[in-house]
Amino acid sequence: MDISRRSALTAITAGTALTGLAACSGAQSSGPDKKTTSKLPLPDTPSGLLLNKSRAARILDENKVDLLICSQARNVYYLTNQVPMTSRLGMGDYSYAVLSAKRPDRPVFITGRYNLYLGGAADTDVFNEIDFKLFSFPEDPVGYGGLTDIKDIINAPVTDAFYPKQHQDAALPPHIQRKKDRDIKAKQAHFATLEGGLLKQLLDTDFKHKTIAIDDPKIRETIAKTDLDVRIVDGDRLVKKMRLQKSANEIILHRYAARANARSARLAANSIGEGATLQDMRGEFFRGCGEQTMKPVYMLIDSIVPELVPREIKRGRTLMIDCVSEFQGYHGDFGRTVCVGEPSRKMKQVTDGLSYIWDRILPEVKAGKKYSDLHALAAKLYGETNLDTGFAINPHNVGLQHTDEPSRADFGLWMKDDIELQENMILSIDMPLLNNGIGGTAHLEDLVLIGKDGAELLNTSDDRLIIV
């Protein structure tokens, strides 16, 4: 298939009338731009924790939290770099990551020896930055089930039948040997169950503020077995506050995720022709993700997310694409407008208008601004385009989730907050136009890193309108 496309120019003067916007179009080129679609080299694996230690310490202090206990796999990963494999296997969250106000620079990982064997990140120095409490299985399961005293639960005899009989025919692979060494080193902190490890952590904590943050209600059951008089607050919200500002190690992974995700989206957009289906296009995006060791999350095409919708792509109808995939947990989020053949004049005016707005918002994306400031500016700029199609803008922090930001209040349903932009936030400025009867849909979305002096684009921001 011969593929060609046009790029909408974005240098549009302020206050230009709609007819002027529509007149701005780029020169035709053949095939996807190599600089944006060449395969990217994988980044080096960060050697230390992903956790933003200084911010974590500040958040714990500001919220007067003595102990943060997390069991959600995403939060465990953020605090420890460890992937709880039992979660991936559908066996539940059988790990805890614990961060104390006394040692916010040194998380505790309470997990099964089997889980450490399967998923422990032993190929980096991160093992040296974590304290481990490992559990295996009670030596007497029946007797253990009848224990009520927490000291008996903590000190219950443990079976040591974990590793198979060891032979000396060949050396173990280095990463396996490191895991085994860590297991042996942590032997004094072995417990019969996950609960025993957490009870020990609770008894060893000095509760200055009498406050524990948890990200899962089931943790309350273990806390209730102690005689601690403590307040319980929303730990998931607390971790999301920490995650607003990325650490240097997170930024390494996120730079790659943003670029590789955008590359895969562009490849998919340029792969289609008249008669192709949404499934064809989505399959190309997933394939591109695989080439870059990215894990596809979803590709929204023309407001449609379900993968089994087989609809054909028609010439002249613009399609919004919203492409999300992740690398080592960190999400890329990229949106464009695609059309087979020339779009209608109205839709071309829309895509030019989105470019006009984005190019003038970008210089204002800086620390100290709030989401509401960006909304107000976007509304003003929309008025300057003379468009009557309607307009939406959704700035959101991106990280270990597509929308990685704390809710307005503890627990309950998530509610969007008016967040103040901060240095080292990774932000999406999301500007979709959904189906409203004008001949198509449109989208413009890039990821930016907020620095000291403004925002840095993490993916190239060309090809606002992709014509194939």
Task: Show where each model-derived region lies.
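Active-site neighborhoods and metal-handling regions in enzymes and metal-associated proteins
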Residues: 2-468
